[in-house]
Amino acid sequence: MNPFVDGAFEAKFLTGDTYSSQPASAGFFSRMLPSLSFYSRLFLGPVRWLCSRASKGQCDDAAWVYASAWVADLVERMGCPIQIEGMDAIEAVDGPCLFVANHMSTLETFMLPAMIRPRRQVTFVVKKSLTTMPLFGPVMCSRDPIVVGRTNPREDLTAVLNGGLERLKKGISIIVFPQHTRSREFNPQQFNSIGVKLAKKAGVPIVPLALKTDAWGQGKKIKELGPVKPGLTIRYTFASPLTIAGQGKEEQAAICQHIESHLGKWQQQDGINE
């Protein structure tokens, strides 16, 4: 029995190559006080549940996927439709791979496990502060992530290469956000090639991922707790796997092109002021 398809939450994104939310509208409380409504449900629901399991050493992969899909369900109930394309690419390679994506908000860290883990083992490259935060820290540590400090690029590269090779050899795929910080805008010059370097060294393919998750905004004092914006569409598009050839410059350019082109298309579809 597959532990990830026993219930509606676990199987939420096991819908083939694409997923599209059913039309929904936010309730009165969510429309009037969207951020308060969302965060109260988030922390009293999946976060509390998953943290409780983590404190007991029970934050396993099935729990991770369940909580991830639960968060996605909460977002939809806020009136934010989810559109996902290209999920066949997650299973298009034999063995582990890298998922290299732009980084826009906290939401992708919550949602990606529900898309990827039912199809293959996966963990993240994360900044150290996420592993020491109250509530989130024990959960993130239970996922055996690759931890970087984001203060010394040379040390971060060593950590990613060494930690990445170790996990890839175990068959664990890795999600990498090469941007220095979360941003609604995408600047290729600030999108480093650490994912390409690791893929080349390990001899594994890269699955590029473009995402738009600004429905969960960035906070001014606490970045993870920004304004929630009902009505904004949440979008993810996976591209076909890339095999690194030579120094990887062409593949790095292809990843950036995938992200830039989709962000531009989504802006036109959704409206510049969305």
Where are the regions that the model predicts?
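Catalytic core of membrane glycerolipid acyltransferases/transacylases, capturing the structured
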Residues: 38, 48-53, 93-152
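Residue-level preference for the first positions of well-ordered beta-strands
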Residues: 96-98, 171-177
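Short gly/ser/thr-rich secondary-structure transition/capping motifs
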Residues: 78-85, 157-158, 218-221
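Hydrophobic/aromatic ligand-binding patch that stacks against planar heteroaromatic rings
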Residues: 115, 139, 166, 197-198
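A cross-family acyltransferase "interaction/gating" segment
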Residues: 137, 173, 184-250
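Membrane-anchoring hydrophobic helices of lipid-metabolizing enzymes
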Residues: 1-96, 111
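Short acidic-hydrophobic, aromatic-tinged amphipathic segments that line or gate anion-handling sites
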Residues: 84, 146-149, 244
